[in-house]
Amino acid sequence: MSHANSQNHNNEGDPACELDLRGVICPYNFVKTKLQLEAMESGELLAVILDDGEPIRNVPESIRNEGHIVVRQEAIGQAFRVLIRKK
């Protein structure tokens, strides 16, 4: 149980894929996220970078409605990084 050199001490694992959807408007950001999730295996993690405003309000909610798990959301500058676990 060593946490030396562990700046990110979560047990979520590394994302299998990351999508940078800054500048992509609704609903296209959700569609791109959904298509990427469909190409992934159950339990894999997807990181999505979204703009503030409509994207960060709508995409995580739509993802939850699809049955996936929003593990974490974190602000990165003017955007947000959302970590999603595929159902």
Map each language-model feature to its residues.
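N-terminal first-folded block
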Residues: 2-32
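Intrinsic-disorder/low-complexity, polar/charged segments enriched in Ser/Thr/Lys/Arg/Asp/Glu/Gln
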Residues: 16, 43-47, 79-81
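Amphipathic, hydrophobic secondary-structure cores in small proteins
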Residues: 21-73
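Core SAM-dependent methyltransferase catalytic element
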Residues: 81-87
